[in-house]
Amino acid sequence: MVTIRLARHGAKKRPFYQIVVADSRFKATGRYIEKVGFFNPTAQGQEEGLRLDLDRVGHWVEQGAGLSDRVAKLVKDAKKAA
């Protein structure tokens, strides 16, 4: 099954997440099909904390991709802000 989920990057104690479309059998930070955005939970001030391509997310959901719990919340927040 194809899933849209977070892939953790960044340094120790400084997480940075790529939002990726990946087969659920692939490891979390490994192979992915497409990158659709990023999430920076430690963004401060004018730094961009979330960038998400809602068109591509919508496309993958139409194709049957599932959303992880955290990504579903981020998509909901991004739609509200847009």
UniProtKB/Swiss-Prot annotation:
Recorded GO CC terms: cytoplasm; small ribosomal subunit
Pfam families assigned to the protein according to its UniProt record, in alphabetical order: Ribosomal_S16
Keyword annotations from UniProtKB, A to Z: Ribonucleoprotein, Ribosomal protein
Top-level taxonomic group: Bacteria
Keyword Ribonucleoprotein assigned: yes
A Gene Ontology molecular function term of the record: structural constituent of ribosome
Coiled coil: none
GO biological process, one term: translation
InterPro entries named in the record: Ribosomal_bS16, Ribosomal_bS16_CS, Ribosomal_bS16_dom_sf
Membrane-traversing stretches: none
NCBIfam families listed in its UniProt record: S16
PANTHER family assigned: 30S RIBOSOMAL PROTEIN S16, SMALL RIBOSOMAL SUBUNIT PROTEIN BS16M
Protein family: Belongs to the bacterial ribosomal protein bS16 family.
Protein name: Small ribosomal subunit protein bS16
Native source species: Aliivibrio fischeri (strain ATCC 700601 / ES114) (Vibrio fischeri)
